[in-house]
Amino acid sequence: MMGWRTVIVNTHSKLSYKNNHLIFKDASRTELIHLSEVDILLLETTDIVLSTMLIKRLVDENILVIFCDDKRLPTAYLMPYYGRHDSSLQLSRQIAWNEDVKAEIWTTIIAQKILNQAFYLGSCGFLEKSQSVIDLYHGLNLFDPSNREGHAARIYFNTLFGNDFSREQDSDINAALDYGYTLILSMFAREIVLSGCMTQFGLKHANQFNQFNLASDIMEPFRPIIDRIVYENRNSSFVKIKRELFTIFSDTFHYNGKDMYLSNIISDYTKKVIQALNQPEKGVPEFRI
């Protein structure tokens, strides 16, 4: 059973293991948390000492561990070599995925993202811009040769953050977007490994320097979750926005007819996308914001 707690450590401390518990110890206190309760461990500072036994047990329990750099930005995460007993079998399937099937599934996933962007613009009152994005959605073709995804993103971000906004800018807005996307990317990467696949082999993403091409492909419909939080806090500092981004771990979202935690949604969504790649008749699940 998956844990439900997100543990954030942001002070000088030592983390160790004893009797199925994570032991947190700093200068003033000691706390114990049973590993079965933990879903995500976010280490926000470099001033933390971990025992190797704890690291081993975190891997055993499939707990997502995210490491931050000296600027408190996500820089790495802990990933096991093998996520399941038949990883070699699933890897052979992944390598043999049909290109036409990959195109169909990638395009379906991107269509969901574009629709979610349009719906969010509409919910913010930008009805004309929302319709423009929907028009781009209706013209989407396999693997998007006309880059309608890019055109939709330009309308979307310029509407939310101004015509002068660019994703290449050095700003608190972009820092917050990147921070939030990295949190979601890490969650998808964990589920991909647990499904027996390699994160490097994507559907369309094929950047040789990107270790998470497949996660980057599958996570696309979920990006507007981060966009909403950043937009609603766009006049706040990066530190304040970052704190609000942590609510993705505790909030529930509607999926498959019920309200669920994001980690559970991502787990189910990833499994079903990979099932659809292995068996195309299964179809891609739908996620709507």
Where are these regions (language model features)?
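N- or domain-start disorder-to-order transition segments that initiate the globular core
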Residues: 1-33
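Active-site helix-to-loop segments that bind/position phosphate- or nucleotide-bearing substrates
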Residues: 3-6, 10-13, 60, 72-289
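Short low-complexity stretches enriched in small and charged residues
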Residues: 18-25, 64, 139-141, 173-174
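A broad, structure-centric signal for solvent-exposed, well-ordered loop/edge residues
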Residues: 24, 31, 40-42, 50, ...
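A short alpha-helix capping/helix-coil boundary motif
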Residues: 32-35, 166-168
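A diffuse structural propensity rather than consistent per-protein peaks
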Residues: 34, 51, 238-242
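Glycine/small-residue-rich interface belts in oligomeric ring/scaffold proteins
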Residues: 35-86
